[in-house]
């Protein structure tokens, strides 16, 4: 694995438990210190749900994807960026350098709309590999929020697993690890 990339998607449901979160941070720090090139894409569903409930907004889902209007995308973006910053700062506390990558800072994902009825839910259309590799070459861990920019720099929410698969495929990573509490079928990328 010395010169190989590993993409890790860590689900928001898994990271609710602070002990699990802290173990994840420790594991990432160890992998980085061992010289393994890792890219992390995180989820955030439970945190998004909590913030929407605080605003008395009921989520509607189609095919497992949250219907996302203009008001909801603003909340989703804020929650995912805050969570991203939490991961980066926790890694820094362990002495591991990481870089936030999201729609407001270092965006690497260009998107197209998934389906009109889903609103601002996108599908990755283009990944900026060069930017990710520049971070890795500095011995830092890129921490990527599942957000992308579409036409006119409109923010789109992306399913975390979909974002992780797109990044892994684009980078031709050796492994894609999906850390989740949801049963998944084996997916070939």
Model-predicted segments: where are they?
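Nucleotide/pyrophosphate-binding catalytic subdomain
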Residues: 1-187
